[in-house]
């Protein structure tokens, strides 16, 4: 167990090896100005500082705050609605209070004017009126770990929240903000 406080913070063991690009999504580099259906590979946006091969993140809401628009939330919950969520009387569900955030990561295949084509299809329908933004996605690429063996002594009987060993006493490898990596 490599946790500094194994009995107080059972889930909080430090990572032994971490491969991480330390920048976040930062500020928006453009706004999506036209609707795009789910499965499309092309969006319309005037972007700065990117070109073919660059990685970007389509963001609904902000990296800090979610979008609290009823239509946005209900589209994500469909066929359900946030208004139908049962909560204690007088309270509002967290999904309405905090809103939703969507982050889609894509690699740009080509840019022609304001038309941006990705190497893969988008996974959400884009409604231009909902405030979709494009952020640059800084990352490391082609990071890999091979021919590495971790050997330990597994507990005979797992008990959820039973001890620090049950709840994350070991975190061996963490990959954060990497692309085309293994």
Regions found by a protein language model. Give the residues of each.
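Extracellular/periplasmic carbohydrate-active domains that bind, remodel
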Residues: 1-182
